[in-house]
Amino acid sequence: MYISKQPFRKSKQPFRKSKQTFHKSKQPFRKFKQPFRKSKQPFRKSKQPFRRRSRIGPGDRIDYRNMSLINRFISEQGKILSRRINRLTLKQQRLITLAIKQARILSFLPFRNYENEKQFQAQAISIITGPRHRKNRHIPQLTQKFNSNRNLRNSNQNLRNNNRNLSSDC
């Protein structure tokens, strides 16, 4: 089978434009007389770094004996503060929690600070509940039904007890 190798030929016909014409909008694009003004002062970077420094310095050792360091990561109630509040890395937080637990076991730290906790609970409860007002919810019809049902139950129980006593006497 013989395949002839013919060179690629360009068509001699000119490029035909599509029949659809481009519709220009009636209003031309507005050209402003004044060019866009760039602000003379470039964007200033804030003085403070974006990532805040952690509370642990480079020389601080995370150890159960380092009480000044450990106390920074414990709340007033004696609970270990979360990583979000502490701004620590995962590794640092893990070491801090281990040090705090070790200090508690070796009685360097109390497990909970009960004095501050009671005070905190009292404040939290008063904030949540607000002042307490007693409402008179006495509905005489319901209480009468309840009392009559209770009386029926008591009388039925008394009858059963009497029947047992009589059967045991025989």
UniProtKB/Swiss-Prot annotation:
GO terms for biological process: translation. Sequence repeats lie at residues 4-10, 11-17, 18-24, 25-31, 32-38, 39-45, 46-52. Gene3D superfamilies: Ribosomal protein S18. Coiled coil: none annotated. Pfam families: Ribosomal_S18. SUPFAM superfamilies: Ribosomal protein S18. Residues 1-59, 151-170 are annotated as: Disordered. InterPro entries: Ribosomal_bS18, Ribosomal_bS18_CS, Ribosomal_bS18_sf. It comes from the Eukaryota. Transmembrane segments: none annotated. One of its GO terms (cellular component) is mitochondrial small ribosomal subunit. GO terms for molecular function: small ribosomal subunit rRNA binding; structural constituent of ribosome. Residues 7-55 have a biased composition (Basic residues). Residues 4-52 are annotated as: 7 X 7 AA tandem repeats. It is found in: Plastid, Chloroplast. Keywords: Chloroplast, Plastid, Repeat, Ribonucleoprotein, Ribosomal protein, RNA-binding, rRNA-binding. Part of the 30S ribosomal subunit. Belongs to the bacterial ribosomal protein bS18 family. NCBIfam families: S18. This is Small ribosomal subunit protein bS18c. It comes from Zea mays.
